[in-house]
Amino acid sequence: MLMVAALLSWFLVGLFIRASKARGWGQPVRKDGPQTHLVKEGTPTAGGVAFVLAMALVFFPLYLSGHAGGERELLIMLTALAMGVVGGVDDWLKIQSRMRGHGKKELLAREKFPLQFLVALVFAWLAAPLASHELVPSLGPVMDVVLIALVMVGSVNAFNFTDGLDGLLGGVAIIVLLPLLALSPVSALLVAVLLGFLWFNAHPARVFMGDMGSHAIGAVAAGAYILYADVWLLPIAAIIPVVAVLSVMIQVISFKTRGKRIFRMSPIQHHFELSGWPETHVTIRFWVITAVATAAVWWLLGARP
């Protein structure tokens, strides 16, 4: 079924690209970013819609027939879809704003964060009894729910900030999820559909992922590590998303308090681009870093009693 998922994703993403071009759904590009990105203006965006749909179309028949795990897998899948909807609203606003030349450009952080946190709280409430262990045993179940929710929101935003270069987030996500393939069918399905997506997202990308895809990825990664492994291993495997979101936070705090920027541009992948690294070098080097970190996680999982 993983091959079916990959092929279905490949087909739906290709269909999405053709439909997007016919309707003029394109990605606006920041003029203050790397000049090499200007050629990407108008590239179809929100391609995550296609691979998330492919994942759902394969998962639910498998689940209903008893071949996709139990309630933990259903919880991860539903959370990924809910987070994907939040990101999808953002994608839709961006596309509509570009096509009309006016209107609301995107969800503001103060609008997006409460929606993310609401989804995360529902997940945390249901996941806490199913998790492999309490995050901090001495704090009790209520704080465990709060911490799980914060991890979920942090993961969604960290993976979202990792997007922006051709193939970067898809490759990073596949590597991060590798240790959990045998444990979590949803993680395995996500890896499969991302392979289908990367066929078109590899440099030079014919489609961008958008927020729906990145939100779903962050939700699956957090859900799988919380329910099957050790949540504290997630920031090790996902070191690139962690650094990406930290670079944004540091940049904002520095500019607001000191009036100075630490990085040429944030998230940090764009800093390296503006420092002279070719886009493909940044992507592959970030994959390598993720692979080394995930190998350490794999070893730590194997060493657990």
From Swiss-Prot:
Q: List, alphabetically, the Pfam families matched.
A: Glycos_transf_4
Phylogenetic lineage: Bacteria, Thermotogati, Deinococcota, Deinococci, Deinococcales
What GO cellular component is one of the record's annotations?
plasma membrane
Quote the EC number: 2.7.8.13
Q: How does it sit in the membrane?
A: Multi-pass membrane protein
Q: Which reaction does it catalyse?
A: UDP-N-acetyl-alpha-D-muramoyl-L-alanyl-gamma-D-glutamyl-meso-2,6-diaminopimeloyl-D-alanyl-D-alanine + di-trans,octa-cis-undecaprenyl phosphate = di-trans,octa-cis-undecaprenyl diphospho-N-acetyl-alpha-D-muramoyl-L-alanyl-D-glutamyl-meso-2,6-diaminopimeloyl-D-alanyl-D-alanine + UMP
In alphabetical order, the GO MF annotations are:
metal ion binding; phospho-N-acetylmuramoyl-pentapeptide-transferase activity; UDP-N-acetylmuramoyl-L-alanyl-D-glutamyl-meso-2,6-diaminopimelyl-D-alanyl-D-alanine:undecaprenyl-phosphate transferase activity
Protein name as it appears in the record = Phospho-N-acetylmuramoyl-pentapeptide-transferase
Transmembrane residues, as ranges?
Answer: 1-21, 46-66, 73-93, 113-133, 139-159, 174-194, 207-227, 233-253, 282-302
Keywords from UniProt, A to Z, are: Cell cycle, Cell division, Cell membrane, Cell shape, Cell wall biogenesis/degradation, Magnesium, Membrane, Metal-binding, Peptidoglycan synthesis, Transferase, Transmembrane, Transmembrane helix
- Top EC class for this record: transferase
Described function: Catalyzes the initial step of the lipid cycle reactions in the biosynthesis of the cell wall peptidoglycan: transfers peptidoglycan precursor phospho-MurNAc-pentapeptide from UDP-MurNAc-pentapeptide onto the lipid carrier undecaprenyl phosphate, yielding undecaprenyl-pyrophosphoryl-MurNAc-pentapeptide, known as lipid I.
Q: Which InterPro entries match?
A: Glycosyl_transferase_4, PNAcMuramoyl-5peptid_Trfase, PNAcMuramoyl-5peptid_Trfase_CS
Q: Which cofactor does it need?
A: Mg(2+)
Q: Where in the cell is it found?
A: Cell membrane
Which Cys-Cys disulfides exist here? none
State which pathway it belongs to: Cell wall biogenesis; peptidoglycan biosynthesis
Recorded family membership: Belongs to the glycosyltransferase 4 family. MraY subfamily.
UniProt cross-references to PROSITE patterns, sorted A to Z: MRAY_1, MRAY_2
Q: Name one GO biological process term.
A: cell wall organization
